[in-house]
């Protein structure tokens, strides 16, 4: 059963603000697929010949080569074997317990061994090779300059014990650079106990393209849409990506252009972005008599940093400033409306994988936005209270999008999605929460059933017949939308 305020579902003509929101590109990084980073198998000492069940009385253990973990920590790991008479197999178990303690702390290359013994007072020495970083080498070629790659590789702690989290983070960040892909191989170094990191590169094409076609449009501007996206991958060998996107509808009532550039900065995952867009529209269908048309122009500048980057979990902080200029013209009434908005958005995005109830993935995006809406003379007249919605001036809002993809087995999965927005006042159409669209309510076009504050819960059952094909069924009975009444009722 679906619930929504009747006023939220009333048809209202799209304007430049809604067109801006509808054509705003979704900035989602390409999937990064990197082969697992595997530690070399530990070399075990062979049992002494004809050792039989020879045992040695062990009062305590001594350790050599341990710097990352303290002797007290390692003593706790081998406590079950201290104060006993041990054979060779049991001594190896104590060595493996030391390795397990290192691996639990993230030192995935650490290896324990039994050096030649000089047993004194019942003490057995366990040596530790902590897997310290030796040399870092590049092999192969890519469009990304070696100097850029070494900005990332130089952050590996040379001479110190390597952790899986450190190596994995830098390799994943390198693979986010446009123009190349890379895999890492761990090899024994020249120095005893050291490990060399070899990064093998593979170049990507300079230009890539994608053609999209869908029926996600609005009846008044054209339901069927076609989009073309072009990417220039690292044309200046800096790992940057330049993108151009054009979208238009079958009726010709909507055309959108988007330009975007991303530049990696430093070697720890910082990225700067700049974007510009322009959309033009004219209304047909039920609103053709309005003779309405308009434009929506936008500029964006942003920065992003990965707080956590790994295979299993990620957390990213993004800050973006934007400025938009919106214009609507209604020929039937000779009315021209114009407005400008500017704002700052802070977004925290996280995702993680787990094995709960058969495994699944979770993604959460939380955004806080504050801005200023300035209206032209005619727009200000229509906006003024008590008859108008009073959207001019400062505004703020918080949005949340949470998704859970739960594996049910046999190519079947369940998707649970929560979309929520809370506004501090009545908002312009470019800032409203739209419940319509393919990602939310497929029964409504983009931007329909919109409001200042509201929530949507969606359940979707998915069956993947083949790896390249997913069938999805969304039941209206599984949808719940609840609108929160704003201070001054004004819901589109």
Give the positions of each predicted feature.
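C-terminal outer-membrane beta-barrel translocator/porin domains of Gram-negative envelope proteins
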Residues: 327-489
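Bacterial N-terminal signal peptides
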Residues: 1-5
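Sec/Tat signal peptide C-region and signal peptidase I cleavage site
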Residues: 6-10
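Short secondary-structure junction motifs
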Residues: 86, 107-111, 179-181, 239-241, ...
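Membrane-embedded beta-strand positions of outer-membrane beta-barrel proteins
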Residues: 209-211, 230, 242-246, 272-276, ...
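Periplasmic polypeptide-binding modules associated with outer-membrane biogenesis and secretion
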Residues: 11-217, 247-255, 398, 418-420
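Gram-negative/organellar outer-membrane beta-barrel architecture
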Residues: 143-147, 163-355
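Beta-strand secondary-structure signal
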Residues: 60-62, 125-127, 196-198, 210, ...
């Amino acid at each position: 059963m679906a619930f929504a305020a009747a006023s939220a579902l009333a048809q209202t003509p799209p304007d430049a603000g809604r067109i801006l929101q509808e054509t705003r590109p979704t900035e989602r990084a390409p999937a990064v697929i990197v082969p697992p980073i595997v530690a070399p198998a530990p070399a075990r000492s062979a049992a002494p010949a004809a050792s039989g069940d020879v045992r040695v009385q062990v009062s305590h253990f001594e350790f050599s080569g341990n710097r990352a973990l303290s002797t007290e920590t390692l003593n706790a790991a081998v406590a079950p074997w201290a104060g006993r008479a041990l054979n060779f197999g049991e001594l190896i178990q104590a060595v493996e317990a030391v390795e397990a303690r290192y691996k639990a702390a993230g030192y995935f290359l650490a290896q324990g061994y039994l050096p030649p013994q000089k047993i004194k007072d019942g003490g057995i020495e366990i040596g530790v090779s902590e897997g310290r970083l030796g040399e870092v080498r590049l092999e192969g070629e890519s469009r990304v300059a070696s100097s850029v790659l070494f900005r990332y590789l130089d952050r590996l702690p040379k001479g110190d014990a390597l952790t899986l989290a450190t190596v994995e983070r830098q390799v994943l960040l390198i693979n986010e650079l446009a123009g190349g892909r890379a895999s890492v191989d761990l090899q024994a170094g020249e120095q005893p106990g050291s490990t060399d990191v070899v990064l093998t590169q593979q170049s990507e094409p300079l230009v890539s393209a994608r053609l999209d076609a869908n029926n996600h449009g609005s009846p008044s501007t054209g339901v069927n849409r076609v989009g073309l996206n072009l990417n220039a991958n690292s044309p200046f060998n800096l790992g940057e990506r330049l993108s151009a996107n054009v979208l238009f509808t079958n009726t010709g009532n909507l055309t959108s252009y988007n330009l975007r550039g991303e530049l990696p900065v430093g070697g720890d995952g910082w990225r700067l972005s700049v974007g510009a867009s322009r959309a033009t529209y004219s209304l047909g269908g039920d609103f053709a008599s309005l003779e309405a048309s308009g434009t929506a122009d936008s500029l964006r500048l942003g920065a992003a940093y990965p707080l956590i980057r790994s295979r299993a979990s990620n957390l990213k902080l993004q800050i973006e400033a934007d400025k938009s200029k919106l214009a609507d013209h209604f020929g039937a009434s000779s009315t021209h409306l114009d407005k400008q908005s500017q704002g700052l958005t802070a977004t925290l995005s996280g995702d993680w994988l787990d094995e709960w109830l058969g495994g699944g993935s979770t993604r959460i995006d939380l955004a806080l936005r504050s801005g200023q809406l300035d209206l032209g003379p005619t727009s200000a007249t229509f906006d003024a209270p008590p008859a108008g919605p009073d959207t001019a001036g400062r505004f703020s809002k918080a949005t949340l999008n949470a998704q859970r993809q739960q594996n049910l087995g046999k190519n079947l999965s369940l998707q649970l999605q929560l979309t929520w927005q809370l506004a501090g006042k009545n908002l312009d159409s470019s800032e409203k929460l739209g419940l319509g669209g393919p990602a939310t309510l497929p029964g409504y076009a983009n931007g329909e059933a919109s409001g200042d504050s509201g929530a949507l819960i969606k359940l979707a059952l998915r069956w993947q017949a083949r790896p390249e094909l997913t069938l999805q069924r969304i039941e209206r009975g599984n949808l719940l939308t609840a609108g929160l009444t704003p201070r001054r009722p004004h819901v589109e």
